[in-house]
Amino acid sequence: MVGPVNIIVGSHVWIEDPGAAWIDGEVVKINGEEVHAHTTNGKTVVANIANVFPKDTEAPPGGVDDMTKLSYLHEPGVLNNLAMRYELNEIYTYTGNILIAVNPFQRLPHLYDTHMMEQYKGAGFGELSPHVFAIAEVAYRAMINEGKSNSILVSGESGAGKTETTKMLMRYLAYLGGRSGVEGRTVEQQVLESNPVLEAFGNAKTLRNNNSSRFGKFVELQFDNCGRISGAAVRTYLLERSRVCQISDPERNYHCFYLLCAAPPEEREKFKLGDPKLFHYLNQSKCYKLDGVDDTEEYLATRRAMDIVGISEEEQDAIFRVVAAILHLGNVNFAKGKEIDSSVLKDEKSRYHLDVCAELLRCDAKKMEDALIKRVMVTPEEVITRTLDPDSATGSRDALAKTIYSRLFDWLVDKINNSIGQDPNSKTIIGVLDIYGFESFKINSFEQFCINFTNEKLQQHFNQHVFKMEQEDYTKEEINWSYIEFVDNKDVLELIEKKPGGVIALLDEACMFPKSTHETFAQKLYQTFKNYKRFTKPKLSRTSFAISHYAGEVTYQADLFLDKNKDYVVAEHQDLLIASSDTFVAGLFPRLPEETSSKTKFSSIGSRFKLQLQSLMETLSSTEPHYIRCVKPNNVLKPAIFENVNVIQQLRCGGVLEAIRISCAGYPTKRTFYEFLNRFGVLAPEVLEGNYDDKVACKMLLDKIGLKGYELGKTKVFLRAGQMAELDARRAEVLGNAARRIQRQSRTFIACKEFRALRGAAIVLQSNCRGKLACNLYEEMRRQAAAVKIQKIFRRHIARESYLRIRHSTITVQTALRGMVARNEFRFRKQMKAATIIQARLRSHLTHSYYKQLQKAALSTQCGWRSRVARKELRTLKMAARDTGALREAKDKLEKRVEELTWRLQLEKRQRTELEEAKTQEYAKQQEALETMRLQVEEANAAVIREREAARKAIEEAPPVIKETPVLVEDTEKINSLTSEVEALKASLQAERQAAENLRKAFSEAEARNSELATELENATRKADQLHESVQRLEEKLSNSESEIQVLRQQALAISPTSRTMATRSKTMLLPRTPENGNYLNGGTKTTPDMTLAVREPESEEKPQKHLNEKQQENQDLLVKCISQNLGYNGDKPVAACVIYKCLLHWRSFEVERTSVFDRIIQTIATAIEVPDNNEVLAYWLSNSATLLLLLQRTLKATGAASLTPQRRRTTSASLFGRMSQGLRGSPQSAGLSFLNRQGLTKLDDLRQVEAKYPALLFKQQLTAFLEKIYGMIRDNLKKEISPLLGLCIQAPRTSRASLVKGRAQANAVAQQALIAHWQSIRKSLNSYLNLMKANNAPPFLVRKVFTQIFSFINVQLFNSLLLRRECCSFSNGEYVKAGLAELEQWCIEATDEYAGSAWDELRHIRQAVGFLVIHQKPKKTLDEITRELCPVLSIQQLYRISTMYWDDKYGTHSVSSDVIANMRVMMTEDSNNAVSSSFLLDDDSSIPFTVEDISKSMQQVDVNDIEPPQLIRENSGFGFLLTRKEGSTS
């Protein structure tokens, strides 16, 4: 990275900081080469200008998704961009074609669900937000399009998330090209399910990671010619063998050892295991358990994973038996023997573990002991056996343990590959490399040397690829780049792998000599590489050496290099294990042909690893590479912590900064012409105002500035390092001058405004004073006027009160007089009205009773007469029964008569009921009146008695009074009054008695009349029942005849000629109607002279049946031929659906057990819609299918349902004719098809339902399926048509350069018109489909459903694209999409609710999201306002995504406040366990949103009467019933 060349006072810069790596500040002083800056933490620091880098103050607050878009591509800019994105949970960032993945240390399931895969499928690179799926998509599409293998290299240090990234890559690749594997498992599933097994045996706890992979893994996914996965293979590299025998605190050995020690008790007992602390290979470290990990559960999970990958129970037992043997082998210790340089087992404990180890390995314990402490040397003269000292014996033990474990791991890998299966015919692969990253610890040994050697090779490959991409970019833009050079690490690789003379070669050479030590090896390195720049010798060290790698200098300790490089294959060990009685153990050590000639063979791990690495590099070189760099943001493995120093070190080690250095060696800053002019156009406004080409304008601007060394490509401006800072400095100067001019004008304006305000205030003050004086004067005048008015009103009030009292008294007197007169008049009229009502009721009752008598007599006479006539006609019909034509006519007449008699019977019943009710009511009324009168008579008698008694007492008391006192006139008058009153009461009593007597007589007469009526009613009922039974018998006979005809017709269609030959009938057989025309054969009646047709020969029966079949086939062919054409519509009713329905109903096809007409109709529909793009045909059949389905839904019912026919009775006949007649009587045709022919088909609600057989019900189901299919095809066709337009509608096209300059209103108007062109295209497509379905009379219900789902699709596509593309979450783009949505809203208004329905409501997500983008003052909005008022539909994840991706490209405003963002993050953390709620993308619903019941409820009734038959069948006699019904309806 080149230091900046243009730093001025006031510039914002990045300065190195020991704690934060880089810290930003503002330059306050420049003193030569020293820069004084005030940092954000409040300190003032001094730094060399070469180590200071400019900061882009206009960078988006959320960072950029591709760091090549950074204005300043340097180390602090990259680090700051990653930190800002990580704070917003944006863990993926591009650097060109490289993906940087920062481990979030938390679950983010919404980033990896199926819907997210669908979004990235087919999307171009960089079109959506950075994602691991985008890298896999690029690799897959490159493989498909170019036919070349691809590879994805995933690297990073332990804990950076390499394994999870690899899993996501595998998932997505399997999603694109997955196939079913063994037992229904996909290849990807099998590869992923192998992970637990490989992790158990190849992962361990290290200082930096609790689950660190101690081996490299390269997964090859093999694809066939169709792009589908056909096989896979897992290849592993450099398992850390030394960890088996040696670990440091607080690390752990491989997981499998601890899992086995935590196995169930019976397992531990079988393997004689216990606490891990008891085993030497495990107790070298004090760490035995991992936090949050249950080793017992992990052990069971590992066993289940082994089952899944195909490892049998026996093999599993053998694997863990070998693991247990290694643990016991580690506890075998040695002591000095009696002889010199000899060794023996140390104690009985060692003996015990040796015996257990031998038992587990199924080998001889004595031979194992000899193999550990003895060596056999073969010379030409003799075989020499020598013993080993304790240290050598321990080394032999450890070598055996490492060899066994290494072979076991290799066997597991081979077993997994065999289980997955490989495709030898595959020509293309996608390889996923999950390998360890660059490592540098305090103590670095042979493992770190090999790992860093691997990373050097990969870095060389990476550098070549990055430089190649730079070259391709320069070549594409046609600029001069030949002088550009980049740093290569070839010298480091030569230092390591050069042969002879490299580190590995010298190490192998030292291992070949038994007397070599780590000191001699180190001295050899010092002598060989003393002049190499990349090799240094640390001071005060005799065994350490340092190599300057691309990621930094690493110091290695050579103490254990020799031991770790030796891969002993001791002949004694080989022979011991080959002789094992366990085939599994023996199979781990196959005897190779070259090993038979020598007892001991030396193998170098370094050389072998070098060959493996060379093979890997050859594989990678033959593929197109793609890079993913995983970064661990902190060492505490917790979310939301970003340690700058840790991350910057990983960026250096991962080659990201190396890629930046390569880019900086050429042209690190690349800007399109539009972006360059938009940013730096202020430096030369005259260039923008001129009508120049963009490239010419950029050249003129750069020439005016005087910049040198730049290059202009075809579409971009390429700037050298530091030139962007120089341009920004000049731009800042221009903007500063402009700001000062604006401030000067602003201050002048503010001063003028303040003066005007003061002047206005003075004027207002004066006006207020004068106004106050005027108000006081007005108030005095107002009070005087009010006093006068109050006096006037008071006097008026007193006078009015006096007047009102007088008026009230007068009215009261008048009211009393008028009320008395009115009450008298009312009483008189009430009495008169009551008398009139009584008279009217009595006369009405008498007249009504007489009328009822006459009516009943008439009905009885009519019923008797009609019954007699019916019996007479029945006898006549029986005589003519053999005549088929006469029988049919008689049947029709009898049907009429039956209906009429039924009506009469029902009328008689109703009259009888009404008569009984009237009689009951009359009787109740009479009883009530009689009771009332009786009570009145009793009260009158009691009153008379009381009055007589009072008169008697008065008379008895009268003489003494007369004697004692003079006779007074008043007493005489009172006596006379009492006497007259008594006489009046007597007369009233007599009248009441007379009335009661009259009522008794009337009641007796009514009872007598009631008895007579009851008798007459019983007689009438008995006659009606008899008549009803006669009618039913006639109906049964007619139905039997009809049933026989129907059965004979069915038998004629079903039975074979042979069976018809065997059948003999003694009964007569009537010629049946054909189901095609409903008439009798030959147009009339055929009878023999004796009115019967005897069945004597088979041929006489075959001829009419053959004719029936042929006629039926002809009619069906004609119908199918007719409906295969476009029959159009009769009004708003589809002709084809109505014709099909009427034909099927007339032919009774719904009621037959076997027919082919349904299959032929379905086949016709299927043939018509074979072309999925013909929307005209699809809309035509959508209308017909819906109408026909509606008719079937309202007509058919399943067989066995309750019949609606009231005359149906169960029959006990067990004969075939009886059962058939019973079934036929349950159908509406049993009442007489002639009734339908005569009356025609009326509204569907007036028709009775048909008991449908299985073929009819199946036809209805097939028709429903075809309706759903046609609906889906129309909907999907419209989706396909608008999908490309939606991709253009989500982002506003860039405006022309004219919009950058003021005074271009006309050009802006033209540009604005062009902006909505895509939206108008969508509107045009919607109108086209709407008009098409209107023209074909598609049901509005289905049209609404189509457009509702289409608008939902638009909502999903626009909303998801908005959330996945940061460039779309801008203010101007929100305005653009809002204008487009207004077009769709206008379309909904024009389409009306009948066809658009609730389609506009389906856009609620994108409407609210766009509304959020275009609102002002977002930082002032609270979270409650946003969630409740602005965006109530959007989830918190969606709001967080929009808020963090928003950027204002128009006014430069910011998104919501940091507090709102923090609250959103808290709410998301609370919902982190809910995978559904974590997803911020929407799903498109492609289901069928309606049922048959919905169609039946939503569609109007269809009247099929007035449908005119098509010309093709109009003149055919077989379809005459269509014309007959039409004529009947018109008449």
Swiss-Prot record:
Gene disruption: observed consequences: Impaired growth of root hair cells, twisted shape of stem trichomes, and irregular size, branch positioning, and branch expansion of leaf trichomes. Affected organization of the ER network and orientation of the actin filament bundles. The double mutant xif xik exhibits aberrantly enhanced organ bending, including increased gravitropic root bending XI-F. The xif xik abcb19 triple mutant has a stronger bending phenotype than the double mutant xif xik.
Residues at which ATP binds: 156-163, 209-217
Myosin N-terminal SH3-like domain residues: 8-57
UniProt key word Cytoplasm: yes
Region (Actin-binding): 495-529, 531-554, 589-613, 613-635
PTM annotation (Phosphoserine): residues: 1517
Domain Dilute: 1159-1470
Residue intervals of the IQ domain: 758-787, 783-812, 806-835, 831-860, 854-883
Compartments reported by the entry: Cytoplasm
Keywords (A to Z) from UniProt: Actin-binding, ATP-binding, Calmodulin-binding, Coiled coil, Cytoplasm, Motor protein, Myosin, Nucleotide-binding, Phosphoprotein, Repeat
Coiled coil (residue ranges): 884-1056
Entry-linked InterPro entries: Dilute_dom, IQ_motif_EF-hand-BS, Kinesin_motor_dom_sf, Myosin_head_motor_dom-like, Myosin_N, MyosinXI_CBD, MYSc_Myo11, P-loop_NTPase
Keyword Cytoplasm: yes
Disulfide bridge partners, by residue number: none
Region (Disordered): 1071-1090
CDD domains for the chain: MyosinXI_CBD, MYSc_Myo11
Stretches with biased composition (Polar residues): 1076-1090
A GO-annotated cellular component: myosin complex
Subunit structure as annotated in this protein's UniProt entry: Homodimer. Interacts with MYOB1, MYOB2 and MYOB3. Interacts with PHOX1 and PHOX2.
Function: Myosin heavy chain that is required for the cell cycle-regulated transport of various organelles and proteins for their segregation. Functions by binding with its tail domain to receptor proteins on organelles and exerting force with its N-terminal motor domain against actin filaments, thereby transporting its cargo along polarized actin cables. Involved in the tip growth of root hair cells and in the elongation of trichome stalk and branches. Plays a major role in trafficking of Golgi stacks, mitochondria and peroxisomes during root hair development.
Annotated PANTHER family: MYOSIN, MYOSIN-17
Comment, domains: IQ domain mediates interaction with calmodulin. The tail domain is a globular cargo-binding domain.
Entry protein name: Myosin-17
Biological source species: Arabidopsis thaliana
Gene that specifies this protein: XI-K
